[in-house]
Swiss-Prot record:
It is found in: Cytoplasm; Cytoplasm, Perinuclear region; Cell projection, Growth cone; Midbody, Midbody ring. GO terms for cellular component: cytosol; exocyst; Flemming body; growth cone; perinuclear region of cytoplasm; plasma membrane. InterPro entries: EXOC6/Sec15, EXOC6/Sec15_C, EXOC6/Sec15_C_dom1, EXOC6_Sec15_N, EXOC6PINT-1/Sec15/Tip20_C_dom2. PANTHER family: EXOCYST COMPLEX COMPONENT 6, SEC15. Its main location: cytoplasm. It comes from the Eukaryota. Component of the exocyst complex involved in the docking of exocytic vesicles with fusion sites on the plasma membrane. Together with RAB11A, RAB3IP, RAB8A, PARD3, PRKCI, ANXA2, CDC42 and DNMBP promotes transcytosis of PODXL to the apical membrane initiation sites (AMIS), apical surface formation and lumenogenesis. GO terms for biological process: exocytosis; Golgi to plasma membrane transport; intracellular protein transport; membrane fission; mitotic cytokinesis; vesicle docking involved in exocytosis; vesicle tethering involved in exocytosis. The exocyst complex is composed of EXOC1, EXOC2, EXOC3, EXOC4, EXOC5, EXOC6, EXOC7 and EXOC8. Interacts with CNTRL. Interacts with RAB11A in a GTP-dependent manner. Keywords: Cell projection, Cytoplasm, Exocytosis, Protein transport, Transport. This is Exocyst complex component 6. It comes from Homo sapiens.
Amino acid sequence: MAENSESLGTVPEHERILQEIESTDTACVGPTLRSVYDDQPNAHKKFMEKLDACIRNHDKEIEKMCNFHHQGFVDAITELLKVRTDAEKLKVQVTDTNRRFQDAGKEVIVHTEDIIRCRIQQRNITTVVEKLQLCLPVLEMYSKLKEQMSAKRYYSALKTMEQLENVYFPWVSQYRFCQLMIENLPKLREDIKEISMSDLKDFLESIRKHSDKIGETAMKQAQHQKTFSVSLQKQNKMKFGKNMYINRDRIPEERNETVLKHSLEEEDENEEEILTVQDLVDFSPVYRCLHIYSVLGDEETFENYYRKQRKKQARLVLQPQSNMHETVDGYRRYFTQIVGFFVVEDHILHVTQGLVTRAYTDELWNMALSKIIAVLRAHSSYCTDPDLVLELKNLTVIFADTLQGYGFPVNRLFDLLFEIRDQYNETLLKKWAGVFRDIFEEDNYSPIPVVNEEEYKIVISKFPFQDPDLEKQSFPKKFPMSQSVPHIYIQVKEFIYASLKFSESLHRSSTEIDDMLRKSTNLLLTRTLSSCLLNLIRKPHIGLTELVQIIINTTHLEQACKYLEDFITNITNISQETVHTTRLYGLSTFKDARHAAEGEIYTKLNQKIDEFVQLADYDWTMSEPDGRASGYLMDLINFLRSIFQVFTHLPGKVAQTACMSACQHLSTSLMQMLLDSELKQISMGAVQQFNLDVIQCELFASSEPVPGFQGDTLQLAFIDLRQLLDLFMVWDWSTYLADYGQPASKYLRVNPNTALTLLEKMKDTSKKNNIFAQFRKNDRDKQKLIETVVKQLRSLVNGMSQHM
C-alpha cells in the first residue's frame, strides 16, 4: 500500500519533468534530469519508463502525421520534377542577369564611392565652416586685443579680455588654440599692470618736476582773484564816499577811478591767460592705471602704492633748502611746490573715487602744516631784512589763501604769521635804529632856520609844531628844535606804515590791528629811539650845546606823541577813547632821555670844570699873593657864564640844577686841590692867593648866573671852603676849638681832619722855608700854640674815629 502510494505521487512529478524537458532549451536539461536522480531511489527507472512511454506516443503521432501528408508530398515531388527543366533555364538566365548586373554595378559602385566621398567632404566642409564661424569671433576679438595692446589702449584690452573669457572662450574651449590664448591672458594682464605702473611712475616723476609750476599758477590765480576783490571793494568804497583805506598819498578820486579801471582790465586779461592744473598736467596715466587696477580687482594695491609714493614726495617737497631764508625766491619755490602738490591731490580727490579720500588729504595736510610751520618758524628767525620778512608774509598769505580756496584749513598759518610779526617788528626796530643813528649823525644840533614863508610851511608840513609867538615873528626866524626832530617824526610815521603792511591781510579786526600798531610804535619809542638817544647822549663828541638841543628836541617829540596817536586812529578808525586802546609811551621815553641828557650835562660840565682846574698852576710856597685871581679860574667863570646863558632855553630846574652842580663840583675840586696828598707844603701866601680865587667863585655865585635861586643858595656851595679859609686867614683857632660841635659854631662846616691836614702842610712849610722864623725869634709862645692846636685837632680826629 505504501509503495503504491509512493508510485502515485511520483507519476505527476515525472510528467512535469517531461513537460519541462520538452519545453526547455537543451542547455538547461541537465538540472532537470539531475532532479530525477535527487528524488527517491529507483525513481529514474520509473522516469525512464515514463520517458519511453512518452516517446512511443510521439512516434505514433509522427507516424499518423506522415501518413496523413504522404500523398501531398508525393504530389509535390512530382510537380517539382516537372519544373526542374524550367528551373535550369531560369538558373542560366539568372546567372546571366547577375553577370550583367555585376558588370553594370561596378560603375555604380565607383560612382557611389565618389558620391560618398563627396558627401563626406561636404559634411566636413560644413562642419569646418560651422566651427570656423564659431572660432572667427574669438580670433577677431583676440586680434583686437593685440591691436589694443599695440595701441596702448590697456583699459579697452582688459575689457576685451573679460569678453573673451566670459563670452567667447566657452564656445571654443575644446580647441588647443583657445587653451593657448587662455594661458596667455594672465601674462598679458601682468604686462598691462607693469606698463600701467611704469606710466604711473612717469606721471609721479612728472608732477614732482612740475609741482612748482602748478603751484605758481594756482597762487597767481588766487592772488589775481584777491586783487580783483580788493579792487571792487575800493571801487564800492569810493562810490559811496567811504574812504576806509588810508593811503599815505592823497590821490584825487578821478585818478583813483582811472587806475582802478586799468587794474580791473589787467586782472581780466591775466585771468584769461591763467592755465588750470589740467592744462599743465596730463592726468590720463592715473585714470588709466586706476581703471586698469579696478578691472583687475587689485585697486587696493594701486591705492596703497599711489599714496605711499605721494607721501614720499610730500616729505621731499616739505624739506626746505638750507639757504632758503636768504632770498624771497627760496621761499617762493618752497611754497609753489607745496601748493602744486596739494592742488594735484585735490584734483585727484574730485575726479576719482577712492584713490584719494578727504580723510587722507586732511591727514596729509595736517602733517604738512606742522612741518611747514616748523620750517617757517626756524628759517624766518634767520631773516634780518624786514623787506624779506614782509615778502615772506605776503607769500605766506597768498599760500594760505590759495590752499584755503581748495578747502584746506589754514588758521594755524595765520597764527604763525602773528608770531612772525613780532620778529618782523624786531627787524624793523633794528632797521629804524640805523635810520635814527643816521639822522642823529647828520643833525647839526642847532635850531632850524627859515628865511621865508615857504620854508616855514615845509617844516610845519613835516612836523606838527604850533607856537603863536614864533608865527608872529618876522623872517628870518628859527624853530626851537633841530632838523632831527621832523626827520624823527616822519620816520616814526614810516615805521607805522611799515608795521601796518605786515598787519594787512592777516584776517584780524581793526581793534587788533590798532593794538598791534600802538604796541610796535611803543617799542620803537621806548626801546629803539630811547636807546639811540641814550647812545647819542653818551657819545664823547656830544658837547654841552648839543645836549641842551637834545633836551629841547625831546620836549617837542614828546608833545608830538598825541599827533602820532591821532595818526594811528585815522588808519584804524579805532577811537582813542576805546577802553582797550593802548596809549603811546612817548612821555616816559622822552622824559628818560631828557633825564639822561641832563645827567650827561652835569657830567660834561663837571668834566669841563676839571679840565680848567687841571690848568691851575699855584706856587704853594709863595710868600705873598699876586693880588688878583688866577687866570684859569677867571677863564672857567667866563665859560660857565656863557654856558648858563645857553641854558636859558632849558627848563628852569634843569638850568638851576646844572648851575648848583657845577658850583658844588668846583668847590669840591678846589678843596681836593688843597688837601691833595701829593701837596706836602703850603704857605700862607698861597692860602691868601687861593682865597682870592674862592672870592671870585663866590662873586660868580652871587651874580645869579641862572635865575630862580633864592637868596644866597648858590653861594652855599662854597661855604666849606669859605669857613676853612677864614679859619686860617683869621687864625681863629680858639673860637674853632671852643665852639666845635655847637650848632651855632662859626666854623661849623670845617672838619677837624681837614683843618689838621692843611695845618700840617703849613707847619712843614714853616720848618723848611723858615716862614715862621720871626715867630721862633720873637714869639715862641705862638709856635707852641700851633703845636698845641695840632695836638687838639688830632685829639678831635681820634675822638671822631672812636665814635664812628
